[in-house]
Amino acid sequence: MKKKERIKLFGLIGRNIDYSFSRKYFSEKFKKNNLNDCVYLNYDLKEINDFNKIINKNPSLKGLNVTIPYKKTIIPFLDELSDEARAINAVNTIVFESSGRKIGHNTDYLGFNKALEEKYKSKPENALILGSGGASEAVKYVLNKIGCDFKIVSRHPDKNQIGYYQISKEIIKKTNLIVNTTPVGTYPKINEAPNIPYNYLDSEHLLFDLIYNPKETEFLKRGKANGCRITNGYKMLKYQAEKSWSLWSKKPKFH
């Protein structure tokens, strides 16, 4: 029993997350760094109201990552938000303090910003963000911060967004960054792609897909076929995961 109590438990909450990057990443890192008392598990929730059941059943929890579709709906279950999480209105990392308080953070924006910096010597001027869910919030935050104009594309656009059917040749030509924040194209539905006019794309465009499985989505393949630069979400995930660990452990990132 004492051995069990010493375990430091971490994990991921989301829906249909067997494919997840996080469990494999952290399990390998724990092993590499000889953190034998640390364990990372997946918690697949049918609905966000199951969150408290997970907490009550796992008193050893020290931290959680949060993925689709709960990055926004998790917020009412938390005691406090970091400034960034509050501004972004989405949480992807939870820290469990010794007092029992649950603090929500957003490390997605750091991951996206760092991955984007690697692709641009100077900032992009105009962008399209495909999707308006929780994953898009960190992207919006970064683009606002660096002064990049953008339009949000949604299947059900509000007054501040546009629909996919409204993406014209003119809009594409004014854009040099297109970010897919939707799950369209994720394994196993790898033949699907966001409905944009790919024939207007060229070498002036960077296509950034937050999806990392498959490595090259149909969205990226179509962009590549038209001469675009492309990148998937792996580096963003790696950078945000390292930041999550620094929050949980209050130590520098993994070696």
What is the predicted function of each stretch?
Residues 2-119:
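Phosphate/diphosphate ligand-binding glycine-rich loop within oxidoreductases
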Residues 2-6, 122-123, 144, 196-205:
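Short, conserved loop/helix-junction motifs that constitute active-site signature segments
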Residues 14, 106-109, 116, 120, ...:
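Glycine-rich adenosine-cofactor-binding loop
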Residues 16, 156, 213:
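Residues in the short beta-alpha loop(s) of Rossmann-like NAD(P)-binding domains
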Residues 66-73, 134-135, 183-186, 213:
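Short glycine-rich anion-binding loops that position phosphate/pyrophosphate groups of nucleotides
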Residues 114-115, 228-251, 255:
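Active-site capping/gating segments
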Residues 145-162:
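NAD(P)-binding Rossmann-fold cofactor-contacting core
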Residues 160-231, 235:
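Rossmann-like adenosine-cofactor binding region
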